[in-house]
UniProtKB/Swiss-Prot annotation:
InterPro entries: ABC_transp_permease. GO terms for molecular function: transmembrane transporter activity. The chain crosses the membrane at residues 23-43, 49-69, 73-93, 101-121, 130-150, 182-202, 234-254, 273-293, 307-327. It is a multi-pass membrane protein. One of its GO terms (cellular component) is plasma membrane. CDD domains: TM_PBP1_transp_AraH_like. This is Fructose import permease protein FruG. It is found in: Cell membrane. Keywords: Cell membrane, Membrane, Sugar transport, Transmembrane, Transmembrane helix, Transport. Part of the high-affinity ABC transporter complex FruEKFG involved in fructose uptake. Can also transport ribose and xylose, with lower affinity. Probably responsible for the translocation of the substrate across the membrane. The gene is fruG. It holds the Pfam family BPD_transp_2.
Length: 340
């Protein structure tokens, strides 16, 4: 090799290379940190053990819903029924609890109801070739209607019910300052278990890899011999069952519910997933990103409350954030040459 030729050979570049698709997730990290800093600077309560504890305890159900919504969105689909499934399972669960049915059996029934709606959605999508939007819109109205038929009253758990163990607060650090303890409850533990399950399921199982493949190109996944139809059933079955689990955590924490509970929660879940960096057209995303997105969504509630802003403005902010993150995703994909 001549000296001239040798000079043309460039050494491989070293150092960290940022994946463009990670930009929306990193943006969510920055936004979350800025929101915490702003809240602390203006109100002095956001970098406190009590605030962090409340954030997780009060929004454990949203973390579960975010994981649930990640699955269909990764395939380019969506599950609009999760909020309505929360309603139907909450109403049925409270009715059964007040009738004296053991708590463990009530929870099993609630999960089975969610699974039935997920199975129905999967059937509509795979056997009747419905778009996920239409299929889950149908199951959303069905679940919401059934919840209203069963009861329109505000239902509460009976005294001494066995659901209370989910909401019982466990202190990790007993801070002498008022409302500044580091604590959690079983609902938070359930949410964290769901996050771990979602991570392992998506990144360390064949079904998880198939989900990403479907999001990339369903036709290509089918040509590769992947079990696309079975995977679609699993996706919507899992999503709906997790929605029922979110209902258990929420109703146990609040102690009551009615047929209108969960209205708009499907949009909160979608917002969490999109803000967390999952591509809305499918094929790329992380469960941990969705969890981060749910925390960004959750912190909006105390922020708007502390600013004295009407609750309606929270919805506007969420809508704008979804718009910004979808545009950011499209821009990143365009730069990367992805025409999907």
């Amino acid at each position: 090799m001549t000296t001239a030729t040798a000079n043309k050979v460039k050494a491989p570049k070293k150092g960290f290379k940022l994946d463009r698709q990670m930009i929306p997730t990193l943006a969510a990290v920055v936004i979350f940190i800025l929101m915490i800093i702003m809240g602390q600077a203006l109100f002095g309560t956001y970098i406190r053990l009590g605030f962090i504890s409340s954030l997780f305890i009060d929004h454990a159900y949203l973390i579960i819903l975010a994981v649930a919504m990640t699955l269909p969105i990764l395939t380019g689909g969506i599950d609009l029924s999760v909020g309505a499934i929360v309603a139907i399972t909450a109403v049925v669960g409270l009715k059964l609890a007040n009738a004296g049915v053991p708590a463990f059996l009530v929870m099993i029934i609630m999960l089975l109801i969610g699974a039935v709606f997920g199975l129905l959605a999967g059937t509509l999508i795979e056997e009747f070739n419905m778009q996920p939007f239409i299929a889950t819109l149908s199951t959303m109205f069905l679940a919401r209607g059934l919840a209203s038929i069963i009861s329109t009253d505000s239902l509460t758990f009976p005294q001494g019910n066995d659901f209370s163990f989910i909401s019982n607060v466990i202190k990790i650090i007993d801070n002498p300052k008022i409302s500044n303890d580091l604590s959690f409850n079983v609902g938070v533990i359930i949410a964290l278990v769901v996050v771990v399950f979602g991570y392992v399921f998506l990144h360390h199982t064949r079904t998880g890899r198939t989900i990403y493949a479907i999001g990339g190109s369903r036709s290509s996944a089918e040509l590769m011999g992947l079990p696309v139809k079975r995977t679609q059933y699993i996706i919507y079955l899992t999503s709906a069952t997790l929605a029922a689990l979110a209902s258990i955590v929420y109703t146990a924490n609040i102690g009551s519910a009615k047929n209108t509970v969960g209205v708009g929660w499907e949009l909160d879940a979608v917002a969490s997933v999109v803000i967390g960096g999952t591509i809305i057209t499918g094929g790329f995303g992380y469960v941990l990103g969705s969890v981060l997105g749910s925390l960004v969504r959750s912190i909006l509630d105390p922020l708007t409350s502390d600013f004295g802003v009407p609750a309606e403005w929270t919805t506007i902010v969420i809508g704008l954030m979804i718009l910004v993150f979808v545009v950011l995703q499209r821009a990143v994909m365009a730069v990367g040459g992805d025409k999907k």
